[in-house]
């Protein structure tokens, strides 16, 4: 694909009245001469589409293929150099916990409420906007959200500008660093939050109304662990802010969207009066796991999903390492051997097991490899490797790897070379 310098400038307008959203996208990129562009696209209706090239508007024909989840855009003549692909479309604010979806909950007064949130990993950004929805096709993003005045809008970056737009408010966010589509985040809801700072990095834990008093532990852990990861990796956290969001309806335990990590409410909220130490430990481990991803996965991303273990094994291993440093009394490495190793070995003994590096051809196969082999067996292998090469050499190797491949993609063999 002769495409480079990709930027998505997208405005989203979620409509809770009929659970749909409107999208306006300007996709800018540099291309070698071509008259056909194929994007990933699913469950989206295209209203308008054209190309801007050298200050001229070029008409196009477009075709959606639901089975291939693709949008083919064809112009009569070839275009090259810097061009803009302009698309106006509508989508579904679904209730399937993927793509751009609605999360239903009850507020303290017993009233039913909705928020809009996203889950794009592994291949569901295409349900929110037409894009090249693959981890290796990194881009920058300029996001804006048009929302009702009683709502607050969130994305990966801080708000650059906020202004009235008719009866609504438009939130414009700063441009993201170069990153994969699956790490983009959009959130619209009636949030409240607690906040702190690490140097000039704003850290917040956001909850639905009536729950922020249960967010203090998570805030404290996030600040502690983030600083420790910076020290260990030798690379500062690169974004100006970090939000941790408690989502009522959430399929995964948590998701490491860069600068806007989402969690199940039960995993992020802690009530010291009623919650156990076991709950506190679980919250600490999940927060640590997601923070590890801000480097392993977000800063350096696997080229394709066969190397998912590069994300998940490291996050599993590092999560235990960092939490153990602050809470040695929990004996986390003993628990790791008992839980992670036994789970992984039991699964690995079955005929249906697979290598850590597993072949993936189609997005539908990706979800199947988010299992104990990718997470726990990989984590155990890394623990064994660290023990073999020594802590210091292991750390040096990781620092070298992260520095070499920051803001780009890597494969398993790139790590071994480091």
Task: List PLM regions with ranges.
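Acidic/His-enriched low-complexity segments
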Residues: 1-244, 266, 271, 370-373, ...
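Hydrophobic alpha-helical and helix-loop surface patches within well-folded domains
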Residues: 173, 199-418
